């Protein structure tokens, strides 16, 4: 099994500061990750603007293409760009573009064990659009071993690239 390093500083930190990071800070972190040899940098969420008010959150809650490109350009580097998309909080059919039109390389789909069906629909949609995908099973410590096994079995039968 090949291991890759994913930096989720922005996405995780955004939970504390409502995703209000300056472009200079984000550029600095991007450059630091490049120098450190990080494989993937997760910028934030692809959250639905129908569910979340842009006036209450910084731009990294939504990771619009123009905001990403303002920091990374065309990202002509070996580091891949990732975003997280939560089941039920992303309008993935609208918010996730075709890969050919995006600087994003991987969509990390976050779901609770009982949401694996919808998560697999998101995986399929993202794969059809040309993205790498990963599934993040949330709050897994609240699940029984059987629930975890079922969720992992579902993911293993999907087109997801990683868990």
Protein language model features and the residues they cover:
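N-terminal amphipathic alpha-helix/helix-capping segment at the start of soluble metabolic enzymes
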Residues: 1-12, 19
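Short, small-residue-rich loop/turn micro-motifs
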Residues: 9, 45-47, 159
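Metallocofactor- and cofactor-centric catalytic cores in central/energy metabolism, strongly enriched
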Residues: 16, 39
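Short, solvent-exposed loop/turn segments at secondary-structure boundaries
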Residues: 17-20, 55-56
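Short catalytic helix/loop segments, enriched in acidic residues and glycine
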Residues: 23-33
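Active-site beta->alpha loop and helix N-cap motifs at the rims of alpha/beta catalytic domains
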Residues: 34, 40, 45-155
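Short, intrinsically disordered, charge-balanced linker/junction segments flanking boundaries
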Residues: 155-163
């Amino acid at each position: 099994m090949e291991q890759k390093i994913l930096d989720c500083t922005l996405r995780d930190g955004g939970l504390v500061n409502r995703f209000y990071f300056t472009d200079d800070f984000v550029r600095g972190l991007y450059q630091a990750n490049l120098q450190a040899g990080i494989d993937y940098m997760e910028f934030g969420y692809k959250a639905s603007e129908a569910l979340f008010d842009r006036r209450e959150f910084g731009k990294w809650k939504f990771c619009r293409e123009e905001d990403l490109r303002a920091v990374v350009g065309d990202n002509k580097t070996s580091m891949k760009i990732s975003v997280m998309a939560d089941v039920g909080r992303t309008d993935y059919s609208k918010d996730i573009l075709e890969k050919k039109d995006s600087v994003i390389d991987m969509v990390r789909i976050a779901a609770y064990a009982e949401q694996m069906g919808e998560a697999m629909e998101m995986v399929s949609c993202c794969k059809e659009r040309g993205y790498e995908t990963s599934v993040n099973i949330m709050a897994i410590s609240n699940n029984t071993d059987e629930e975890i096994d079922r969720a992992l079995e579902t993911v293993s039968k999907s087109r997801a690239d990683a868990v």
